[in-house]
Regions:
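Short, conserved phosphate-binding/catalytic loop or strand-edge motifs used
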Residues: 49-64, 112-117
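Conserved hydrophobic/aromatic pocket- or pore-lining residues that grip, position, or stack substrates
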Residues: 39, 56, 93-96, 104, ...
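Short glycine-enriched loop/turn motifs at secondary-structure junctions
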Residues: 41, 118-120, 225-230, 270
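N-terminal DNA-binding module of tyrosine recombinases/phage integrases
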Residues: 1-54, 247-264, 270, 274
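Short basic/aromatic active-site micro-motif
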Residues: 51, 84, 88, 275-276
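Basic, Lys/Arg- and aromatic-enriched nucleic-acid-binding interface segment
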Residues: 69-83, 87-89, 102, 106-166, ...
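Conserved tyrosine-mediated DNA breakage-rejoining catalytic core shared by Y-recombinases
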Residues: 115-116, 130-131, 164-253, 257-263
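Non-catalytic DNA-binding core/recognition domains of DNA-processing enzymes
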Residues: 11, 22-41, 56-57, 74, ...
Length: 276
């Protein structure tokens, strides 16, 4: 990397030399979007050596006045960038400039001296047993009922529920009788950008679902969880084990009825045609 290089050119090298090795598809999509939408338009043409602490402070001020860019067709919910998004931009640049120091492009990291914005972490609302019971009693959709039970009884996240496959569900008579019924969480379902998948290859991706509309910029994928600690065995209460058995039975009946029209991905929570 030349010592006299612009921020834009350096970040391009940073993404290809560092990001493609270290980031998963979600992080790659997020970080490249931050670079394209908020970093390059503001400081991309500057020389790396010209980015001093005062430049960083001015850039920070500019971010606070910046309008969010529409993402994947979704309109922004706020008029200005949120502190959480500004924090993401600054952390990304801090990481990039740290590599610039390591690669001897610059002598020191001007982003080390930035005070990150105060991000208000709203406490999660915890549902009471009564609210959970009411929600389950009022649920008329069998698929949603199964998903809600997995969320409440097993504390599974949405991606984990949608990525759960029957081969990881242990609900035999013997399992239930011995209080040994469980699900094994080793993957999650998420949506990733097509460009990120093409750039990174299928690292940590188990399956890419064929899109219904081929020209879309994203793909639904089954992937390895972000951290190894997320891979775990979760025990099932007997009531939920029986709910899952009934759901499997009805899913198999539908599969038999639809025949070849059913797209069998072995998903526990799937659309009537088997797709996620």
């Amino acid at each position: 990397i030349p010592k006299k290089t612009t921020v834009k050119d350096f970040l391009s090298d940073f993404v290809s030399l560092y990001g493609e090795r270290k980031w998963g598809v979600s992080a790659y999509a997020t970080n490249t979007r931050l670079i394209e939408n908020y970093i390059n338009p503001a400081i991309g043409d500057m020389q790396m050596q010209a980015v001093t602490t005062i430049v960083v402070d001015r850039f920070y001020k500019q971010l606070e006045r910046t309008k969010p860019v529409e993402c994947n067709g979704r309109k922004p919910r706020t008029e200005k960038l949120t502190p959480a998004n500004i924090e993401k931009v600054i952390k990304l640049l801090r990481s990039a400039f740290k590599q610039a120091v390591r690669w001897e492009v610059i002598a020191r990291n001007p982003f080390d001296f930035v005070t990150l914005p105060k991000v208000e972490r709203k406490p999660r609302q915890i549902w009471t047993v009564e609210i959970i019971r009411k929600a389950l009693d009022s649920c008329k959709d069998a698929k949603l009922f199964v998903a809600m039970n997995l969320a409440f009884a097993c504390s599974l996240r949405v991606g984990e529920i949608l990525g759960l496959t029957w081969d990881n569900v242990n609900i035999s008579d013997e399992d239930i009788a011995k209080d040994n019924a469980y699900v094994y969480i080793d993957k999650e379902l998420t949506r990733a950008s097509k460009r990120a998948i093409e750039t990174l290859g299928e690292k940590d991706i188990y399956y890419i679902f064929t899109p219904l509309m081929p020209n879309t910029s994203t793909r639904i994928i089954l992937k390895k969880p972000k951290t190894d600690s997320s891979i775990r065995k979760v025990w099932l209460p007997k009531t939920l084990a029986y709910i899952l058995r009934e759901w499997k039975k009805s899913q198999d009946e539908l599969k038999g009825f639809l025949g070849d029209e059913y797209q069998d991905f072995d998903l526990v929570v799937a659309l009537p045609n088997g797709r996620p």
